Amino acid sequence: IDGCVDIANEVGTAKIGDPYDLFIHNNEEKALYAVESWYSWHSREDYRNNIYSIRNAYYGTRTGAISELSLSKAVAAVNANLDTEVKKAIDDAAAAIWAIPSPFRNNINSPEAVSAMEACATLEGVLKGSLKSCIEGIDKTVLAEVVKNYVDVVVLPTYSDLKAGNQALF
């Protein structure tokens, strides 16, 4: 789950937060260049997709459906309220990012950008706090099945798609 914690932190504090901090300190040009994907106008999509990667890891699928062999199901079996909290934090972060007016490069200091940073911080806190300690108490054989499912259903197909997409470029 540490990778998911890192992603939530990076989206909130670096990808949105760094340009925001530069902008509010009157470094507007540097703020613009600090925006990831500013030239393609797809920053919000990239940031939301980062949050979706957390969702994919937690749900054990790439579709938004929850696998029976997911971390979500394993957590729900021991703490249904925590599972609901994690899912809400993921959904809230993705929605807050999408609520930033498009393009992000023209709305760096918007109230919605601040809300997105806060939602990412909340997600990070839930992941590295309650969720991490809950996972430590889940049976290792259950977690092994969750990891196997994640690798087989999320990781390997993702890399296969990336490889195919890369080959299509040439």
Describe the residue ranges of each PLM region.
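Mature extracytoplasmic or organellar-lumen-exposed domains after removal of signal/transit peptides
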Residues: 1-170
